[in-house]
Amino acid sequence: MRIALFGARGIPHTYSGTETFFGELAPRLAARGHEVIVYCRRSLFSRRPSSYRGVRLIYLPSVETKSLSTPTHTLACAIDVLFRDVDVMLVTNVSNAILCIVPRLFGKNVALNVDGVEWNRSKWSSLGRRYFYWSACLAGKICPDGIITDAAEMQRIYQEEFGTRSVCIAYGANIENSADPDVVREYGLEPFKYYLIASRLVPENSADLIIKGFEQLQTDKLLAIAGDANYRSAFVDGLKRTSDRRVRFLGHISNSDHVKELHCNCFCYIHGHSVGGTNPALLKAFGYSNCILALNTPFNREVVGNYGILFQNDPRDLAAKLETLERHPDEVISLRKRASARILEKYTWDHVANQYEDYFRRLVAGDSPAMDSPLGMYVPQHQELATTQVLSGPR
């Protein structure tokens, strides 16, 4: 198959989970003999190689502002792809739904990964949230056979709220171990002597709640916050006004090896994401064998299962859970040992690639996967064949 992917910043890029998703999925599809294109935002790449791990890269312009970067780049991609011999395209972000009309009018097969419930994100204006909701309403009408949700709860929301059937395919994660624990000392940290937040500093990721809970904890451990906002915000300024000297702001860290070491050597990873589906940052933490303490939401519960601890949307409850971990370090060790099993159970990137490959084949063949598949995680019709292709490499 000839497959095009767009809607993200491009690859290789580490800003968010969408770029990680493209960076993991596209090379795996290419390794199976498919011709894969990933579109990249030209202004974000000073170096512009023509390929990456067997994937062709195409750089197109965008207007780099908070509200215009995604739609302007997606529009450029949607027009460019019309002039290429592509069997199927994967577009991310529900805000791009309206732009999928362009390739759909020309008979192209389009799959739209709707991502999270963007209309609930406080970082957007009231007008922006209404636009996301309208896009979600429209998505199933534009791509009736091509809607992808990344969690069972998201699948339920789209069916009950918008009457839209979807295929549920989650994200994945790799299992990685620490290679150089001394890296954390470059950030003023000591291995297993700090708690970690690793996320964009936006209100729905709950860094304010986590800081308030941590401030109530009697411990000599630090709270390391790896991440920042893409744009200047009063929310971030407020976070940094904490008087607790144990709270350390590390800023955005683009070095993936450093991100890995910060994860692998933390005492506990605290995940405060309150909006969205299967969160790539949470899966990544499991892949790094973290002890996971996650905000209790339907999406987080779905991923965490019995492999981590949940806290309520209350600093006092978080403080109590932190205190329990402080008193029972053996529980931390036990959760760390079990974490990677969660990834192997259902969230490996090879499994995700199997699902997408099978799903794309069915779209190209004219099937209706969303209508034919039961609710819950998508099960490839040709799973054994797909696994064989992974093991045997390129065709």
Feature roles, as predicted:
Residues 4, 186-218, 224:
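Conserved donor-binding/catalytic core segment of Leloir-type glycosyltransferases
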Residues 309-316, 324-330:
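Conserved acidic donor-binding segment of nucleotide-sugar-dependent glycosyltransferases
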Residues 8-14, 22, 28-65, 153-159, ...:
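N-terminal strand-loop element at the rim of the active site
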Residues 261-277, 290:
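Acidic donor-binding loop of glycosyltransferase active sites
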Residues 71-82, 86-119, 277:
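An aromatic- and histidine-rich active-site surface loop
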Residues 236-257:
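Nucleotide-activated donor-binding/catalytic signature segment of Leloir-type glycosyltransferases, i.e.
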Residues 82, 105, 128-147:
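Membrane-proximal helix-turn-helix segments that form the acceptor-binding/catalytic region
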Residues 137-180, 189-192, 197, 248:
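Donor nucleotide-sugar binding/catalytic pocket of nucleotide-sugar-dependent glycosyltransferases
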